[in-house]
């Protein structure tokens, strides 16, 4: 009986102990499940910013591209202080930094706030440095160099050395060349990756921003291994990087640089506010060079914001006598004048309202061809009298004055032409020799091209094609070609302009073996108070051909300050001759060997 009682007590005690044990386990489990657990963070996201596309010249020089910029940082909680000197020594070896840079890191670390753990070791690392440092970080991680710590979220992690892509650097290898037309970019924060990327602000960078901009960033998401690398398996997310397009230009680097050099040399003498030169392939509208003396480094822009503007399309001005051929052509096309006709030029002096108009070549009479050859304002007034207001303004509209040329640049101005309903006789007279309207350099270049392109107006084009996803796409679909002048009228005007150089005001541009024609223009600059007596713009627009090639060339010299250089024959015309010589030297033109020079644009 006594034995039975002992067994029963033992069983009850055992049952009680087991119940107590289960209760302890239950309570402990509940506490463990409901409390914060310091579990190592095993997930990782990794981004790589897709890059903006490159810009490449006709002669296959990359003039603009992008690169990735990285920074190296460390969480100070991941490293023991007694190991930091060793770490810095390894960091210096792998990054290639100097002793001074190491000293700077130590100094900044001493000044680091106590509760600020994230420390940037080095910024502006290139891809090569970043690759070496990533290798170092991996080795140190595997060897247990870094210690684990509990972060603010209660998770245990070992951050160690992190190499982070933080910026896309836009590089302009050609420095100030091709500016201002190439434009520039500014940096904004990419919301997905948190990396600074570039967007176009001016020039080609702006116009083709959608094409040049990256399509898709690289993204890898998944579990990480002991070395901090993402484990690639069926559960990981991988998004491919798609960079922006590479833009191929019609512009030639060699030709552009040669013309820019010639412009700079001329402007040392002329002291002009700006010199602009454009060269267009007449039959295709391709711009082979578009140069300015007002250039800048896109990576180090100054405070003068006006330099950033592309004056070739954004500066509207009264062009003077270079407008005469278009009024002349309008009268010829409408049958208001005949080429064999002689017109009264009043001995080179003519009363227009309260003003007296004088010609440089004082003649009682001139043939129609001589009116252009000698740039007679009086002759043009007589021609304008035969046109009514609608005819003269419509004639300008045919050549696309008053509308954008369509060139692939942003912020193009369309200029101003007068309202025919409000055009008085005196205003119509001065319009005939280039006052009372505003035009741009590019409008004039495209309009003069008609005379050298069998009467066809064609859209000027800086870019030829772009490359993306393994294939080229031509941009020819954006080029408009329109017959606006009969072949006969275009041929007549071409010959008239050839005579300007061979027999008239453009003799300084004569080049042996080259068929060249064009027109000078000198115009006072209008200000709020009226026309100034000492500020002028000088222009020359024309063409230069050989047996197989035809180019339309424009020169604008804005406000030259050298005495008497405001005359186009003393400033713009010699610059035109420089360009023709460059085209020959660079083998764009080949002088004709025999003396039977005939036009090549039939």
Task: Give the residues covered by each predicted segment.
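Beta-lactam-recognizing serine transpeptidase/beta-lactamase-like catalytic domain environment
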Residues: 62-64, 224-238, 275-321, 326-561, ...
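Periplasmic/cell-envelope proteins involved in peptidoglycan metabolism and beta-lactam response
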Residues: 1-300, 390-400, 509-512, 528-531, ...
